[in-house]
Every structure is written in C-alpha cells, then in structure tokens.
Amino acid sequence: MTIGLLGFGVVGRGVYEIIASRQDMKIAQICCLEDPSLPDVRVTRDFQTIVQDETIDTVVEAMGGLHPAYEFVRAAMEAGKNIVTSNKALVAAFYDDLIPLAREKGLKFRCTAAVGGGIGWLSELERAHRVQTICRVRGIMNGTCNYILDSMTRLGLGYDQALKQAQALGYAEARPATDVEGIDTWHKAILSSNIAFGVSLDREQVPV
C-alpha cells in the first residue's frame, strides 16, 4: 500500500510513526503547511501532487475539520484513491455524498477510527447491519462528558469543578466546547446511526 498523507499535526504524525514501522505499506507524500524534514518522504503544500501521483493508491486524511478536507478527499476519490479518515465531522456531514461515491468507484472508504476506534465500534456495526436488523444504538459516546457527569453525580461536584478536574487529568481540552456542547456526541451518533440503520442522517435532521 502506497499512501498520501494529508496533514501532519498530532494525528498525522502518529499515523506516520505507525506506518514507518510497517513493511507492507509506505508513505510516498505528505501534504502539509510546514516541512517536517522527513527522510524518504516527499513533502508538498500542493494537494494536486498527491492526486496526480499514480503510485499512491490510498489517501489518509488527518487534517480535521470540514474544509478543505472534504474537497481534498473527494478529489482523491475521483482520482481513484481509497480513503482512510478519523474525521468524524467530515464523515457525518458528507456521508451521503462520500459513501455512494466510494461504491460507484469501487473504492474503500474506511472511517472506523472516527468513533470508538480502539474497540472497532463502526466496523462491528457494519458487520451486524449486513446480517441482522439493528433496532437501537446506545452507548457512551463522549468520554469527557461521561467523566464530568459521573463526577457530578457520584462525587457531588459542581459542573465547573468537574470540568476543571477533567482538564487537569487530560480528559478535557483547554477549549472543551466541542465535547461539552454535544458536538462530538452529535457527530458520533449520526455516523453510528447511518451505518447501523443504513440511512443518511445529516446535521439538519438531528438537533443538538
């Protein structure tokens, strides 16, 4: 497998380190704003060099956000490249566009890491959906909220105190809005429902 990597932040660097230890795959190009000076890897700021590289069969999107991640991913798919992403916001927002395109092109679109990556949540939902009818999906979708609510309920902490404790322990970001305002759970619930029930929910249909 020959990979084009989009983004070289925390996620992108982690992907690079994992793949660098593998013999069955390699990163041919990385598209990012700053040159990380890596051996044996071409670094570019022009995404089109990855799209036009015929040796690259898979693009790993590690940019985050919706734009330009969506435009880059779609262009890569139009060029016949498989996609791997952990970007739950991207997949939730454009599920009914990207998944049909992958089927039309005969491509693999892998987004298991977007929700419960460590337990293979989405891949298990996908397998279950193929062989039986799923009636309900439920679970703890956000670890930050789970910790805060547990601390408030079980320990009697106030919200502000529980949040500060979660931040001190590294469970919550310094800017926790995506977690505590339900956005992260929103994306995960939409994506899980789309796969479990074979539907195409979007952010307009599911209020938060």
Describe each model-derived feature in a short phrase:
Residues I119-I134, C145-D160, H187-L201:
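Oxidoreductase and adenylate-handling cofactor-binding alpha/beta cores
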Residues Y70-A75, A79, S86-R127:
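Rossmann-fold NAD(P)-binding glycine/threonine-rich loop
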Residues S21-P39:
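NAD(P)-binding Rossmann-fold cofactor-contacting core
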Residues T2-E17:
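Glycine-rich adenosine-cofactor-binding loop
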Residues I134-C145, P207:
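NAD(P)-dependent dehydrogenases' Rossmann-like dinucleotide-binding region
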Residues V43-T44, E61, V84-S86, F109-A113, ...:
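General beta-strand structural signal in soluble alpha/beta enzymes
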Residues Q161-V208:
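Substrate-binding/catalytic subdomain of NAD(P)-dependent oxidoreductase enzymes
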Residues R45-S86:
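Rossmann-fold NAD(P) dinucleotide-binding segment
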